[in-house]
Amino acid sequence: MLGVDTGARAGLRRSLEDRSPAGVAARRRFLTEALGQLRRQPRTGLDPATVTSLAVAESAFRTALDGTALPYGVATIGDWRNTPYVVIQNVGAWLDVPQMLDGDQPVRDRADAEAYLARLAATAAQLDGETVRSRQARAQGLVPPSFLLDKTIAGMTRTIAEAASTGGPFVGPLARKAATIQGDWAPRAAAIARTTIVPALQRQLAELRAQRALATDAAGMGTRPRGAEWYAWGLRAGTTTRRTPADLHAMGRARLADLQAQMDVILRAEGLTQGTVAERAIAFQKRPGIGFPDGDEGRRQIVAYMQGRIDAIRPRLPRAFRRLARGNLEIRRMPLAQEPGAPAAYGGPGTIDGRVPGKVWVNLGDPSIHNRVTIPDLVYHEGIPGHVWQGEYAQALPLIRSILAFNAYSEGWALYAEQLADELGMYEGDPAGRLGYLMGLAWRAVRLIVDTGIHSMGWSRDRALAEFVAATGLPRSNAESEVDRYCAWPGQACGYEVGRAEIVALRSRAQATLGRRYDLRDFDQAVLDGGNVPLDVLAGNVSRYVEGARAS
């Protein structure tokens, strides 16, 4: 983890995770041993923070261990990106390594530059480890949907061409970062890319093409070996609950109906009275002044508009938090190879030492997917007071707590952060922005519907796209990236609304219990200071805050 790879741990910045079958087996042994130690640890006499840390680690390790018992896929330890497919359009070292080297790997001196090269030299082995696991999964009958493989093959083909000619995304970051450091860094990096990484990528591409020859357009896990079992685990990992697909599907339907009623009020006030809510929302987004130009000028304006929204909310944050984080943030275009299969944006905090800022990675491949309706909500979710903001509080916790994360908390907080932006008045006099906020909430409600529809009810990709577009009013290009993401990460999309709903329910209970003693700043601080936790642990943290507030 960058930011802690100093001193005795400095060697970490030269290495990469072992993604081979042996690496997975080693992680399983670690999880088994660590979980046993945690369960044997007495809780009596420990302070609440330590008890919480033990509960968090035990939950993360138990879920990951259960995931590694499944015959295929990626089961992360305290992270959100669990997937049945080791390599796909948004998963794999072919994407992770370039992004990490570009966005997070520090290059301040010769030692840092050598560490970059060491990681580059380790990349081929990481790629080959993934290829072996992908081949093993194919032998068990697991093949991704054809439409995901088409995106992956196209993106990897472009990456190989770039890496073979100039070094592409593997070399460019080092050439830029080491420009003032004496040494032949870029030529050395290009040689590594050309002689080791490109051949490994070609081997991985050959495996993907072998899978494509067997692939069908079946989108969900229901048609795949042990798919229902994998999806049940994916939902548990993604929501930190045992809620069933049917329950989550119904929850999404009810939430969507409420949000569409609110959207209808805005659209009617704007003179849009004919057609469905989604059709009218689409029409509103086509009005002059809502979109951005094509090409680089549009990309520049999009980034500037996003930055403007971040700048505007900062002065209002003291109304929602007792203690302000730094909010160390920059907006960056995501790697080009990633854009075709990626969402509109995603974000996260920087390094623990603060030297590398948090990022909102924005998809600028097609500027038309962004407009002045959708951007404000997007940056509050990904940036401040969403993922980047929350992540900085987590980094103040003990190291194990800053590393472990739970999808339902992370995404639930970011969705709640969108609500905070509304409550802080960010949409006053801005019907376009408030419509986008409601569209964003509807989008997350639809995720419950579509994710469970694909993986539990046997929906096709076309059925999922039709449901998504009809419900949200988002452009079809956005919908395709979203639906394809749900196909690649079963269960992950359900954590957003489940997490938000739990935070809001806990807030309502705190208000009812505390009455005049309730203060939004204290509630939000309790949710953040308790760290990234499973939802049952979050409920306990909030209960302790309420008890303390009543006692005072």
Describe the residue ranges of each PLM region.
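N-terminal maturation segment of proteins
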Residues: 1-552
